[in-house]
Amino acid sequence: MNMDIEARVKKVITSCIAVDVDSINGQTHLVEDLYADSLDLIDIVFGLSEEFDISCNENDLPDMMTFADICRVVKKSLESRV
């Protein structure tokens, strides 16, 4: 399941930012490494909400700066639904 979540998170990121999926790893920073701007970050948050059917908004951004952070937030949101 973790690999599925990671692959889906990568899909969301690459649909919002023009980057190669292979350039994303656990410590990839959205702003510093992928040069995401504020609109990209909001697109990612809303993309995650749609992809995983979770409640996620721009207030979650401070906790979602790296790929690993995003996966952790998504997993936590999915677990809280159960």
Swiss-Prot record:
The keyword Phosphoprotein applies. Coiled coil: none annotated. GO terms for biological process: lipid A biosynthetic process. The modification O-(pantetheine 4'-phosphoryl)serine is found at S38. Keywords: Cytoplasm, Phosphopantetheine, Phosphoprotein. It is found in: Cytoplasm. 4'-phosphopantetheine is transferred from CoA to a specific serine of apo-IacP. Its main location: cytoplasm. Disulfide bonds: none annotated. The keyword Phosphoprotein applies. Residues 3-78 form the Carrier domain. One of its GO terms (cellular component) is membrane. GO terms for molecular function: acyl binding; acyl carrier activity. Pfam families: PP-binding. Acyl carrier protein. This is Probable acyl carrier protein IacP.
